[in-house]
């Protein structure tokens, strides 16, 4: 399994629409950087957010998530409250090759401000926008800039294709658009 370079990412994105829209260079002046880098792709956060709130004194339950736990926000700058959390999505839409897994890590610009970004792996065959989890670990409000970089994606190509891809097993987040809240498959 090898880490894929910029040339591979560019070819997959331009020829197979692995990342759309795709930015061929790294954009970084006056913004939190995004676009193609040496061994990865810096994704952008869209202008749609779901900010966690405690106004209803609900318990967060991943098996029975109550949408009253979040407040929808759309704008160029999202303020994440102190010691709080927001969900967002990428500007980019991904179509993962059947032999490739992607891992996403937060950007140092935000990490150095106490903002932690968590994204689960992009499995082989996955398609959709990526839901991003943003934690403000500081005792102060934190700004998140829409349409700018939020995290870096690293692509790992397997030595061989897996037997069952995310799309083959009809993963519950397949083809997601927008910010997708937790889902649990119902027993039949």
Swiss-Prot record:
Coiled-coil zones: none
InterPro entries in the record: dCTP_deaminase, dUTPase-like_sf, dUTPase_trimeric
One record GO biological process: dUTP biosynthetic process
An example molecular function term from Gene Ontology annotations: dCTP deaminase activity
Catalytic activity as recorded in UniProt: dCTP + H2O + H(+) = dUTP + NH4(+)
Pathway(s) per entry: Pyrimidine metabolism; dUMP biosynthesis; dUMP from dCTP (dUTP route): step 1/2
Residues annotated as binding dCTP: 107-112, 152, 166, 176
Keywords: Hydrolase, Nucleotide metabolism, Nucleotide-binding
Known EC number: 3.5.4.13
Its job: Catalyzes the deamination of dCTP to dUTP.
The protein's name: dCTP deaminase
Name of the gene this protein is made from: dcd
């Amino acid at each position: 399994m090898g880490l894929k370079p910029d040339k591979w990412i560019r070819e997959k994105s331009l020829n197979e629409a692995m990342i759309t829209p795709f930015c061929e260079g790294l954009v970084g002046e006056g913004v939190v950087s995004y676009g193609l880098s040496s061994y990865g792709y810096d994704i952008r956060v869209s202008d749609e957010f779901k900010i966690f709130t405690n106004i209803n004194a609900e318990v967060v339950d991943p098996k029975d998530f109550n949408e009253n736990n979040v407040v929808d926000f759309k704008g160029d700058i999202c303020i994440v409250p102190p010691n709080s959390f927001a969900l967002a999505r990428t500007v980019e839409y991904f179509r993962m090759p059947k032999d490739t897994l992607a891992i996403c890590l937060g950007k140092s610009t935000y990490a150095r401000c106490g903002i932690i970004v968590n994204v689960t792996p992009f499995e082989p065959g996955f398609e959709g926008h990526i839901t991003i989890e943003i934690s403000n670990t500081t005792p102060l409000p934190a700004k998140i800039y829409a349409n700018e970089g939020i995290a870096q994606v690293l692509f790992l190509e397997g030595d061989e294709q897996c037997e069952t891809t995310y799309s083959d097993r009809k993963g519950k987040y397949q083809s997601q658009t927008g910010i997708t809240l937790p889902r649990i498959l119902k027993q039949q």
